[in-house]
């Protein structure tokens, strides 16, 4: 594994690559669930150029979807949730309960969906920021609620970046 660090309007982003060149992690500074940096291998800011380019386009309002190879390291349930997150359209939100229903889970599974959502290792590209509480309120986000709000505002065209 190797990693790169790129600047963004949200601060530095750490991009983690597998040896096969897949994106395995995208973490913001002070990310709540970021593994220790030493687990990412050596720093090489030339890895994952397509990811960095697409993120720059996203922040410049030129991209609404990503097309980069992803590597999910998690339980089968977490991977199911993370895959479903990619179907939430740009600029829209859904609730944990609605996401649980879309996955065909039993009533009350929204908490499990929320826990899996919170462990998403590939922020922004796997848009866990688009999931909100049942009342529309902002709830947990690994990069912090301020960044979650900034991403939602950005996608609605209300942001400064």
Annotate each predicted stretch with a short phrase:
Residues 66-70, 113, 138-141:
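Short clusters of hydrophobic/aromatic residues that line enzyme substrate/ligand-binding pockets
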Residues 124-130:
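Short Lys/Arg-enriched helix C-cap and helix-to-coil transition segments
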Residues 85, 110-119:
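Major-groove recognition helix of helix-turn-helix-like DNA-binding domains
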Residues 94-95, 108-113, 125:
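Short conserved catalytic/interaction loops centered on acidic-Pro-aromatic/His motifs
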Residues 134-161:
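…primarily DNA-binding HTH/wHTH and HhH modules…
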